[in-house]
């Protein structure tokens, strides 16, 4: 479960065992957590699920994802290549 960003107390990370799911990122801060899908072609973010997050928390996380969208996508792609044994 590599962490790729820690901003404003939010840790953004991936899981290695999620099969062939589309690009997404998990985030956690204290007892709040969520998963967001990233639509690369449409430069869009959609909430997959959220637990114990206020509307403000969701807005903050979405803003962080948009501000680091290209970086998250790049890290996702590198992570998947390493996981699949295809190098960096």
Regions found by a protein language model. Give the residues of each.
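Alpha-helical interaction segments
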Residues: 4, 15, 26, 59, ...
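C-terminal structural segments of small proteins and small subunits
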Residues: 55-88
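Negatively charged, low-complexity tracts enriched in Asp/Glu with abundant Ser/Thr
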Residues: 1-12
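Sequence-level detector for tyrosine residue identity
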Residues: 13-15, 51, 71
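A short, structured beta-strand/loop element
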Residues: 17-55
